[in-house]
A protein has these predicted regions:
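Sec-dependent signal peptide recognition
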Residues: 1-7
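Helix-start (N-cap) detector for alpha-helical repeat units in TPR-like alpha-solenoids
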Residues: 40, 74-75, 108-109, 142-143, ...
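Canonical tetratricopeptide repeat
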Residues: 45, 79, 113, 147, ...
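Structural signature of tandem alpha-helical TPR/SEL1-like repeats
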Residues: 52-65, 86-99, 109, 120-133, ...
Length: 221
């Protein structure tokens, strides 16, 4: 198995909140996105340990050393991008993720990461393009559908956002954040779909999503 450091951001848009539980590493199916450069097991372990400790300088140096061995390694670029983002270097992170998809367009995590970074910049249409490309590469990526829903919701495309959230839940019924976002969407309808909003909020809570006092007050009205 190979490993990919995963980027998690909090994105706000027109009443929807995408929020993930931070997990520094994620396993990827062998062959799905390539491998790290050969003979870099120790470097990979060093980078992973540094990432867990939020030692961005050490993690960055490890991935840069990997790239000195293979400048076109998409996975190393993706991991370096995650380090740069966590270190607060959004521009550098974006450059790394762009390199990643240049060398391996099938790396869905990098398309999602680019979408989140563009969203944070306020570039909604570019973010929408990135999430759409992620879905093109893997139509069953529930996170990409959730992120796309948030983006198109910010443009007022509520029906399309609802469809994307429903698809995310269909793909992953235990995707608590998608249930939470769908609850918010139903709450913001005119008139609000109270029963559906309550249903999905309760489901989100049962899946580990924290309480939202503002939403709870609105649901109690």
């Amino acid at each position: 198995m190979i490993r990919l450091i995963t980027l998690f951001l909090i994105v706000e848009g027109a009443g929807l909140l995408a929020q993930e539980t931070t997990a520094p590493l994620q396993r990827m199916p062998l062959g799905a996105s390539g491998t790290l450069p050969a003979d870099t097991v120790i470097l990979a372990q060093r980078a992973a340990a540094a990432f867990a400790k939020k030692d961005w300088d050490t993690a960055r140096a490890a991935y840069q050393e990997m790239l000195s061995l293979d400048q076109e390694n998409a996975l190393a670029w993706a991991n370096l991008g995650a380090v740069q983002q966590q270190a607060g270097l959004a521009k550098e992170a974006m450059e790394c993720f762009e390199k990643s998809v240049l060398y391996n367009p099938g790396l869905v995590q990098s398309w999602n990461a680019l979408g989140l970074l563009y969203s944070a910049k306020g570039d909604t249409y570019q973010a929408m393009s990135m999430f759409s490309r992620a879905i093109h590469e893997d139509p069953e990526d529930a996170r990409a559908h959730n992120y796309l829903a948030i983006t198109i919701r910010s443009l007022g495309w509520n029906a399309a956002a609802e469809s994307e959230l429903q698809r995310a839940i269909e793909l992953n019924p235990k995707f608590g954040i998608a249930h939470f976002n769908l609850s918010l969407l139903y709450m913001d309808q005119k008139p609000p779909s109270m029963e559906l909003a309550k249903l999905h909020y309760k489901k989100a809570q049962s899946l580990g999503v924290g309480k939202d006092e503002v939403l709870e007050r609105r649901l109690a009205e």
